[in-house]
């Protein structure tokens, strides 16, 4: 699910999904009609191609813990399903995402930097621009603390939810993205990072790592 904030409000939340194999097509299509702007794709090729078309106009991509999960996952799936040449669509100027290793909580992780298009991990924005320590930095906990909303609860694994209750799976996915959009609507940390970058004549991602830049701006 994506939230495209440059679209009219009723079209901003868009969900692309594949139906569970055992679910009849007619039933999957009916479930999709219960949600706005929800598209059942024929296969993963179509899903990834549509996703890349939707983000074409995006200057900034953001997600919760997206540096360590969403970005590497979707770039790697694009390589495997569509081919490496298609990953240039994540970037500008016909460049390709650049693989980068980094250490988080003592563990080495791998992500991709998107050339020409900015990616800001909202979890890292939240940790950087709030001045209180939270017991948990899960989206569920932050959503409840900041806007009084939580993720949709479910039992078992996400894979089990997908196969046993496709409607709830879609609702869960959409709520995750809606939570993030509402958080930024309140906190405006993407705007803050943008203002700091312009004020200090640095690239947006620099505001995530350069303490001196932030202190100078404040």
Predicted segments with their positions:
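Conserved DEDDh/DEDDy metal-dependent 3′-5′ exonuclease domain
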Residues: 15-133
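Generic recognition of stable, solvent-exposed alpha-helical segments in well-folded globular domains
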Residues: 46, 50-53, 69-73, 117, ...
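Intrinsically disordered or highly flexible coil/loop and linker segments, enriched in small
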Residues: 57-61, 131-135, 152-153, 178-179, ...
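Acidic carboxylate-rich catalytic motifs and surrounding loops in phosphoryl-/glycosyl-chemistry enzymes
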Residues: 66, 123-125, 156-158, 194-198
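C-terminal or mid-to-C-terminal helical accessory/interaction module adjacent to the motor/catalytic core
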Residues: 129, 134-167, 173
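Common nucleic-acid-contacting/processivity interface regions adjacent to the catalytic cores
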Residues: 159-218
